[in-house]
Amino acid sequence: MRQSGTSQPLLINMYLPDPVGDGLFKEGKSPSWGPLSPAVQKGSGQIQLWQFLLELLADRANAGCIAWEGGHGEFKLTDPDEVARRWGERKSKPNMNYDKLSRALRYYYDKNIMSKVHGKRYAYRFDFQGLAQACQPPPAHAHAAAAAAAAAAAAQDGALYKLPAGLAPLPFPGLSKLNLMAASAGVAPAGFSYWPGPNATAAAAATAALYPTPGLQPPPGPFGAVAAASHLGGHYH
């Protein structure tokens, strides 16, 4: 995709101290850029391939192996083996060759950083607009949204309390009482859904055993549930 000259000085301002004008690209002249900024030309192995190529292109002394060709960010590897050798030297990979380097370049196609110039061998084109966008750090709200989504997924999944399927109920009498209390109050106990609570018949039997006198009902609220649970504790041990 051919980019207009308006987007290209943005990248040059980011990585090169001597930006060029729009007319330079429109006229198809060869850019005469200065050396890359110190942050790019440190020579560390952390440099990315696209930065390395810009570093070579910034120095006309490298025209024997790589050079700008025309405008619109197009360049050509005049000696692809030499470019690959230098890239391997920078990354401490002595087995680097053009086949491996070209595979790395293809990674940039999907990122809209670079594209292959069809019909020209060893010719590529920088997409400066896509490269500038790729260099933008993700917004802070994106990290917050990702964290919130992960927390919501964990809560929905019950990951904090879920037990393996097929596990027999543990011999802990308090859990059966807890289920009975929750069932009487109409609330499911969070985190202990693995143990089913008593059915309605059992709850009615517990109430009748505690309050045999007609018209006498358990007190409202959790106190009645506690009383019923205490009385029926032996039935669920």
UniProtKB/Swiss-Prot annotation:
Region (May mediate active transcriptional repression): 129-237
Biological process annotations from GO: cell differentiation; maternal behavior; neuron fate specification; neuron maturation; positive regulation of DNA-templated transcription; positive regulation of gene expression; positive regulation of transcription by RNA polymerase II; regulation of transcription by RNA polymerase II
Molecular-function GO terms, alphabetical: DNA-binding transcription activator activity, RNA polymerase II-specific; DNA-binding transcription factor activity; DNA-binding transcription factor activity, RNA polymerase II-specific; double-stranded DNA binding; RNA polymerase II cis-regulatory region sequence-specific DNA binding; sequence-specific double-stranded DNA binding
A UniProt-annotated Pfam family: Ets
DNA-binding region(s) from the entry: 47-127
Subcellular location: Nucleus
Primary localisation category: nucleus
Keyword Disulfide bond attributed: no
Keywords: Developmental protein, Differentiation, DNA-binding, Neurogenesis, Nucleus, Transcription, Transcription regulation
Superkingdom as given in the UniProt entry: Eukaryota
Coiled-coil annotated residue ranges, if any: none
A GO cellular-component term linked to this record: nuclear speck
Tissue expression summary: Specifically expressed in central serotonergic neurons. Also expressed in adrenal gland and to a lower extent in small intestine and eye.
UniProt xrefs under InterPro entries: Ets_dom, ETS_fam, WH-like_DNA-bd_sf, WH_DNA-bd_sf
Family: Belongs to the ETS family.
Function: Functions as a transcriptional regulator. May function as a transcriptional repressor. Functions in the differentiation and the maintenance of the central serotonergic neurons. May play a role in cell growth.
Name of the featured protein: Protein FEV
Species in which this protein is naturally found: Rattus norvegicus (Rat)
